[in-house]
Every structure is written in C-alpha cells, then in structure tokens.
Regions:
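Sec/Tat signal peptide C-region and signal peptidase I cleavage site
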Residues: 33-37
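An exposed, glycine/acidic-rich loop-and-rim segment of catalytic or binding clefts
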Residues: 38-399
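N-terminal secretory signal peptides that target proteins for export/translocation
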Residues: 1-15
Length: 399
C-alpha cells in the first residue's frame, strides 16, 4: 500500500483508503445504489505487537454510511468519517500511522484509558488502610493507569446486537496487581455506531477485590478534519458551572471552584483559542486547557448533555452526553511537532481537543470528590454518547 500511496500522490494510506471508499460509493450510485445501506461490521489484520499478539482493525458503518474504525489494541479509535454541510466526508479523529506508533508514542490517541483515567497524585493512594504504590509515569504522578495500562493491551472483540445500528464489545481482564492496582478487574466496553449518527460508548466493570477505577476514551477531535491544522477557531460549550483547580503538576487541589470570570467559562459557545494564551494561573500551569469540568448534572446518574463542539467552516457538530460527573477538556498541549499523524502531517498544540468524560482526577486522595471505589459484587456502568451532525440546534441544558 505504501508504494501505491506514493505513486498516486497521496500523503498517507488512510487518505488513499478514503479515496477508494469514495470511488466505491460513486460506483454504487452509478449502478443504481442508494445513499443508505445496511449497517456493517468488518475486520481485517492490522499488525502484530512487539509482544507477538495479532491486532485487527474493525470498521463499523451505519445505515447512512457514517464510518468508524478501531483496533483490538487498546480499543483505539483510529478514524471517524463524518460529512460536512455540503456532504464532503473527512476523518475528524486524530490518529497515528502504524501499530508501532500506537505502542510507543505518547498521547493515548483514541484509546480506552484505565484502570484509572487521568492522574493519581504522588502515584499512590490508600484504600481500607492499605497504601498502594503505583508506577509513576507523569513526573511523580500516575497518568491513565500507568505505563502499561489498558490502552497498551490487546482486547477481545465480539460483535454485539444493536437494534439501532452496529456494535462490538471489547473485553479485557486485568489481573490483580496490574500496574500495582488491587483486584482482578473485568472490563467490557461496547462501541455502538447508531443509525442517528452517534457513537455510544458503554462501560461495564467488575472486580474481585476492593479497588479504584476511572474510565474514559482519549480520542482527539478536529472537526475540520484530521491534519487540517489548529482547532482554535472551532467553538466549544461545556455544561459546567464549576471545575477542579490544579497544582503546577496538574493534580487537583481538592477545591471545586466556579468557572465564572475565568478562561474556563464555556457556558456559552466560545472559540477554543479565544483565551488559550491567558495569563490566568490555571492556564499557565496546563499550557492551555487540561482541566476537569464538573458537569451540571440532573438527579442520580442520568445521561445528560455535557458539551458541544462546532466548526463554523464545515458545519460539523459533536454533542456529548454522559452519565459521568465530569469531562476533561484537553487542547493537545503536549504535541510539539515531533509526532506525524495518520494524515501525514505533524501534530502540534491545538491540533485537536478531547472530551474525556470521567470521574474526577485523584479522587482516591480527595475524600470530598465523588468516590471511584468499586467493591466485589458491584458492577460499574457508564455511558457516553458522541452525536455527530451539521449545524444542528443546541440541545436543552438540564440544571
């Protein structure tokens, strides 16, 4: 594929694959095909890990032709193909070029992150009177579960029935002591690409020993298209009156503070880059946005509107709904041009943004934060939905 890619003048195999898909769609139309087709789930070999495990790539396509691709390695979402207001399709998920890149490069691109997403301060926590010393992989802290966490594992993938689209369930059993966390953790994550053009992510997690957990998906979005440049002019709304302030090493202080009067106030649509260079101390600490927003939730764990992102140029919209209490907005501050993405371009700060639905960072060390403890006999359930559209009305904001 590499030689053919160069011969035809494409910058990457992903670009060439999308070109072939467009040609196939045109051929279907010429032969009398229609725009809508039955939802499908296909898979093909993708490569072999450094540890010798075979990895497959899965392609989900809904009735309207919306397409998502993911790997059995880390559950990595490599591609989300979404039309703009004129019907032009672009991949809006940042990705990497090869399996080896996903194994070795930083950034957690598109991956399922756990056993504990985000940071645990000092790489330790105390549970039931016992202190667990984790593996520090972010300065003195533990980030996204450790250096060899669930985003670096091969998951079992099974097709799943979905009345409203196409679905697959990814399963992994993390042994007791994995990355020094207690308990054998059984995790099932179901990706559903619905026929109303949404990606639904459902988590189901159980343990055989008291432990702590936090799960999210670490996809970077660029609504103008992967490799199109900065998202600074794309607009964002976050349904949050409060956030959790951080220390210089990005650990929550334990305070829950109002966003009003700060650059973290996204309660109305605002360009992501409008206040990115603010001298506000929180922005200086994170070199941009890397903050946990406390969502304005309804009663209980109800699925509520969390955030909207919009690209005025293309008209593409993502609306995010979740049962989680918070969302981490991250503006890819760690990207410095050293990583070449699947688009063939180098990734830099503001090349993409994340909407990482989650419990609060460092909750095991902050008793005033919502608990992340999980006990035997309990099953943790969480749902996040990313709905894709163009120029759509804003959902109502629950209070």
């Amino acid at each position: 594929m590499t030689d053919l890619t160069r011969c035809l003048g494409f910058r990457s195999s992903a670009k060439l694959a999308r070109a072939f898909a467009i040609v196939a769609a045109l051929a279907a139309a010429i032969s009398g095909g229609t725009a809508d087709a039955a939802a499908t789930l296909d898979h093909a070999p993708y490569g072999t890990t450094q540890g010798g495990q075979a990895v497959d790539i899965f392609t989900m396509t809904n009735d309207h032709g919306l397409r998502l691709r993911f790997l059995s390695y880390g559950g990595v979402i490599t591609e989300i193909d979404v039309p703009d207001r004129a019907g032009r399709v672009e991949d809006i998920a940042l990705g990497l070029r090869t399996l080896r890149d996903y194994e070795t490069l930083p950034g957690h691109f598109g991956a399922i992150t756990g056993r504990y997403a985000n940071r645990i301060g000092g790489a330790q926590f105390t549970l039931n009177g016992q202190t667990y010393h984790l593996i520090a992989n972010n300065g003195p802290n533990t980030l996204h579960g450790g250096p060899n966490a669930l985003d670096h594992q091969s998951w079992t993938v099974s097709p799943t029935q979905a009345p409203d689209g196409v679905a697959a369930t990814l399963s992994y059993v993390s042994p007791d002591g994995d990355q020094n966390f207690p308990g054998t953790l059984t995790t099932h994550v179901t990706y559903t690409l619905t026929n109303d053009n949404a990606l639904r992510v459902d988590y189901a997690v159980s343990t055989d020993k008291d432990t702590v957990i936090n799960f999210t998906n670490h996809s970077y979005f660029n609504l103008a298209g992967n490799g199109s440049g900065s998202v600074a002019d794309q607009t964002l709304l976050v349904n949050a009156d409060r956030y959790t302030p951080i220390t210089p090493d990005l650990i929550p202080t334990g305070e829950i503070a109002p966003v009003e009067g700060t650059p973290l106030d996204f309660r109305h649509m605002l360009p992501i880059g409008a206040r990115l260079s603010s001298a506000f101390q929180q922005m200086v600490y994170a070199h941009g946005y890397d903050h946990n927003f406390v969502l304005n939730k309804g009663p209980g764990d109800s699925l509520t509107f969390a955030a909207r992102a919009y690209d005025p140029r293309s008209g593409r919209v993502i609306d995010c709904f979740t049962t989680e209490p918070a969302v981490q907005v991250y503006t890819s501050n760690g990207m410095n041009g050293s990583v070449v993405g699947s688009s063939g371009t180098t990734y830099r700060q503001t090349e993409g943004f994340t909407l990482e639905t989650q419990h609060f960072p460092d909750s095991p060390n902050k008793p005033n934060f919502p608990t992340t403890e999980l006990k035997p006999g309990q099953e943790f359930h969480s749902t996040t939905i990313f709905r894709f559209a163009t120029d759509a009305p804003l959902p109502s904001l629950p209070r």
